[in-house]
Amino acid sequence: MENQQHQVLEQELWQGYKDRGFVVTKFSDLVDSVVRWSRSGSLWPMTFGLACCAVEMMHTAASRYDLDRYGVMFRASPRQADVMIVAGTLTNKMAPALRRVYDQMAEPKYVISMGSCANGGGYYHYSYSVVRGCDRIVPVDIYVPGCPPTAEALLYGILCLQQKIIRGNPGVRGA
């Protein structure tokens, strides 16, 4: 379906070029696509490591996986970050802090939920003190499954977020 839409658009652009020698497009669409492309290539995640998933998150920044080559640079301050990676078990006491940090991030902001505990409570799902998924506190864009998920899985989640931003899906806020 998406490929057919792409082919139709390509034919319309080529026909316009053949008829007039140039292509006319809506300037706002062009600017939006350039902005989405640039945002996808310069993600600055803020780590919110709560448990063992945070160790795997650290591996992605090391030389073997090297997130820098994708334009991803970890930030310590929420005011400098546009992506929050929630990694690990979120307790009821930590939930207000998570929300406060999320609110301090500038728009557009995205959230990656990493690991079974962040996705749905994981091993501690039935504990009275555990939030059963960080999506109950903040809106989540990408879920990375696993206990703990591998560094490759997080890398794939980041690449999926980049593609979501480029496509400009309505589910992605601010894109």
Curated annotation (Swiss-Prot):
Residues noted as binding [4Fe-4S] cluster in the record, renumbered to the chain: C52, C53, C117, C147
Entry-linked SUPFAM superfamilies: HydA/Nqo6-like
Record note on cofactor: Binds 1 [4Fe-4S] cluster.
Cellular component, GO annotation: plasma membrane; respiratory chain complex I
Cofactor: [4Fe-4S] cluster
InterPro entries in UniProt: NADH_UbQ_OxRdtase-like_20kDa (IPR006137), NADH_UQ_OxRdtase_20Kd_su (IPR006138)
Membrane topology, record value: Peripheral membrane protein
Swiss-Prot/TrEMBL keywords: 4Fe-4S, Cell inner membrane, Cell membrane, Iron, Iron-sulfur, Membrane, Metal-binding, NAD, Quinone, Translocase, Transport, Ubiquinone
Catalytic activity annotation: a quinone + NADH + 5 H(+)(in) = a quinol + NAD(+) + 4 H(+)(out)
Top-level class of the enzyme under EC nomenclature: translocase
Localization in the cell: Cell inner membrane
Pfam families: Oxidored_q6 (PF01058)
UniProt-listed Enzyme Commission number(s): 7.1.1.-
Molecular function terms from GO: 4 iron, 4 sulfur cluster binding; iron ion binding; NADH dehydrogenase (ubiquinone) activity; NADH:ubiquinone reductase (non-electrogenic) activity; quinone binding
One of the GO biological process terms: aerobic respiration
Main subcellular location: membrane
Function: NDH-1 shuttles electrons from NADH, via FMN and iron-sulfur (Fe-S) centers, to quinones in the respiratory chain. Couples the redox reaction to proton translocation (for every two electrons transferred, four hydrogen ions are translocated across the cytoplasmic membrane), and thus conserves the redox energy in a proton gradient.
Similarity field: Belongs to the complex I 20 kDa subunit family.
Assembly and binders: NDH-1 is composed of 14 different subunits. Subunits NuoB, C, D, E, F, and G constitute the peripheral sector of the complex.
Name of the protein this chain belongs to: NADH-quinone oxidoreductase subunit B
Natural source organism: Anaplasma marginale (strain St. Maries)
